[in-house]
């Protein structure tokens, strides 16, 4: 049986994602880091960026976050974000709206234009692959 992590991404407005995933990549304050099942316990601040995760069905999804905290243990990853936008939708217009909202969220969180461009480019690339 495949090992999975329970991922929860929550904002003050409610849950953004809750489900089983194979892996998670997070924009940590000290740099991007990945989490697999069995990871050591960890607490970290999150910078503005994208959380990328592979769902149990193999599909990769992204969530843009402005900042937050993450608690990792061997079986779960709990993200508490100030703001987050799930990148996805059933149509190109929904995906374009999510990308625009993510860009706004990131621009409000940081004035580092290089970081914003990098994250938005990654989000756009992933969104194109999901349609």
From Swiss-Prot:
Mode of membrane association: Peripheral membrane protein
GO cellular component: plasma membrane; proton-transporting ATP synthase complex
GO MF term set: ATP binding; proton-transporting ATP synthase activity, rotational mechanism
Gene3D superfamilies per record: F0F1 ATP synthase delta/epsilon subunit, N-terminal
Compartment annotation: Cell inner membrane
Top-level taxon: Bacteria
Membrane-spanning ranges: none
Pfam families per record: ATP-synt_DE_N (PF02823)
Primary location recorded for the protein, binned into one broad class: membrane
Record key words, sorted: ATP synthesis, Cell inner membrane, Cell membrane, CF(1), Hydrogen ion transport, Ion transport, Membrane, Transport
Described purpose of this protein according to its UniProt entry: Produces ATP from ADP in the presence of a proton gradient across the membrane.
Quaternary structure and partners: F-type ATPases have 2 components, CF(1) - the catalytic core - and CF(0) - the membrane proton channel. CF(1) has five subunits: alpha(3), beta(3), gamma(1), delta(1), epsilon(1). CF(0) has three main subunits: a, b and c.
The family this protein is said to belong to: Belongs to the ATPase epsilon chain family.
Name of protein: ATP synthase epsilon chain
Species this chain originates from: Wolinella succinogenes (strain ATCC 29543 / DSM 1740 / CCUG 13145 / JCM 31913 / LMG 7466 / NCTC 11488 / FDC 602W)
Phylogenetic placement of the source organism: Bacteria, Pseudomonadati, Campylobacterota, Epsilonproteobacteria, Campylobacterales
């Amino acid at each position: 049986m495949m090992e999975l992590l329970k991922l929860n991404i929550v904002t003050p407005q409610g849950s953004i994602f809750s489900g089983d995933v194979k892996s998670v990549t997070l924009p940590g304050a000290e740099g991007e880091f990945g989490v697999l099942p069995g990871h050591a316990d960890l607490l970290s601040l999150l910078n503005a960026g994208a959380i990328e995760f592979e769902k149990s069905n193999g599909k990769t999804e992204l969530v843009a976050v402005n900042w937050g905290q993450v608690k990792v243990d061997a079986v779960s990853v709990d993200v508490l974000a100030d703001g987050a936008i799930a990148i996805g939708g059933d149509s190109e217009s929904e995906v374009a709206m999510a990308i625009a909202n993510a860009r706004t969220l990131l621009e409000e969180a940081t004035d580092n234009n290089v970081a914003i461009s990098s994250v938005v480019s990654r989000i756009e690339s992933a969104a194109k692959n999901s349609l």
